[in-house]
Structures are given as C-alpha cells and as structure tokens.
Amino acid sequence: MNPKNLKKEVNRCGYNFSLKKTLQYLLMIFLGIILFSVLLKVKWQYILAIIAMVTVLYPSVILMIFRNMYEEKKFEDVTAYMEQILYSFKRRGKILIALEDARTLFFDEEKEKQGDLHEAIGRAIEHIQTGVAKGNIYQEAFAIIEEEYGCKRLYKVHDYLIQVETSGGECNEAIDILLTDRKLWMERTYALLREKKNIKTKITIGIGFSFLIIYLAVLMIPADFGITDLFISQIVTTGVIMCNILIWFLG
C-alpha cells in the first residue's frame, strides 16, 4: 500500500496521518530488528530479507491499529447515543426532542468540531423537521444514523421509539429493559476487548521468550564450531524471526 492510499484510509477513520512519524516508527523497528539479528548472529542478507518483510507488513499493521481505534470509538459513540436517547425519550416522550438532546453529546468542545455521529443526528433532525417523507418519517430519519452506526440493538431501540411515538402507551418499563440490555452488551464487549489485549500481551511475551532462548543457545555454542555461519542455521534463525513477526501480526 502506497503512502497516499494509507493516508486516505487513515483519514477515513477520522484520524490524521503523519508520514514523518510513521517513518520514524518504521526506522525504530528496523533498528530493533538489526540489533536482535546481530545478537543472534544473522548475516546481513537475511537481515535485509526480514526488513523487506516488515516493510511490506507495516502499512497493514498501521491501518489495522487505526481501524481498531475507529471501531472502538464507534462502539463508544453508539452506546452513549443509545443511553442518551432512551433517557431523553423516557423523560420527554418525543423522538425529535430526544434526538436534539443526544446531538449535544457529540460535539467536541476542545477541538470545536462536530463528530460523525453529531452530523448524522443533525441530518436526522433536519429530515424530521422538514416533514417530507416517502414513508414513515421517523424510520427514514433513523436510517440516516443507522447507515453508519447500524447494529441489532440500535435497530431495536429505534423501532421501539417509533412504535411508542406513533401508537402511544407506557414506555418506562420497556426503556429500563433496553437500558439494562445495553449495559450488559457493553460489559460483554469490553470483556472481549480486554481478553483480546491480554492474548496479544501473552503472544508478545511468548515471542520475547523465544528470542531469549535462541540468544542463549547462540551464546552456548563455541564460536570455533562455526555452526551459526552454516546456511541451514541462518535459514532456521531467519525463519523463526519471520514466523514470530507473522504470529504477532496475526495475533
């Protein structure tokens, strides 16, 4: 992936891409690879092969990091939106007012800019206020938000609010159930994210130990044996380093 495409993809996730910082991090990784490889007595032609592989993988790793951050931010936004609109509707009983209350939650005062969800809610409010619709005006308004943030629980919340808005009736108990369901969903999702991070940490520690074992093995071999200079030794050591990098990347 060339830098322009990488920058474009990162910007789509709502983050600023700095080519200078990205290259600085890549240079630090190269220095780390060279240091480890020299300690393991890997020859330069094999070190260059490792560096080439890392160079190919690096843009995908960067993009994966930003996409994960983007998905986590989207999850935080949609759960905050669900909570706010449910509480507002429970208190005021009107979808339009509940949307207006929810929109204020997503304005970044420090950066003085609107978030993506703030903009989507604004367009939904505008659609309701115009009063022009091909079908159910609330369904069409909520569809604007669901286009980017849609998920089963959000659909359920929106469908219920439309039902109460159009048919009336007592909604406090049902909204409490939806709020509880949202809370449990958040707890399960954050538990999964913590577990994923723990697995990544364990993989990193395991890779570190594997490098330590190889290094100790190299130290224990007398230099006059010349084993580390053998072609098969260089290939195996290089293969182990590459496999560990791939395992970390896929983990």
PLM segments and residue spans:
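Hydrophobic alpha-helical segments characteristic of transmembrane helices
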Residues: 1-10, 85-102, 152-191
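Membrane-anchoring/interfacial helices and their immediately flanking loops
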Residues: 1, 129-169, 173, 205-236, ...
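Alpha-helical transmembrane anchor segments
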Residues: 1, 20, 29-49, 53-58, ...
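N-terminal transmembrane hairpin
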Residues: 1-81, 88
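Alpha-helical transmembrane segments of integral membrane proteins, especially early/N-terminal helices
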Residues: 44-48, 116-130, 165-169, 201-202
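Juxtamembrane/interface alpha-helical elements of multi-pass membrane proteins
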Residues: 52-140, 145
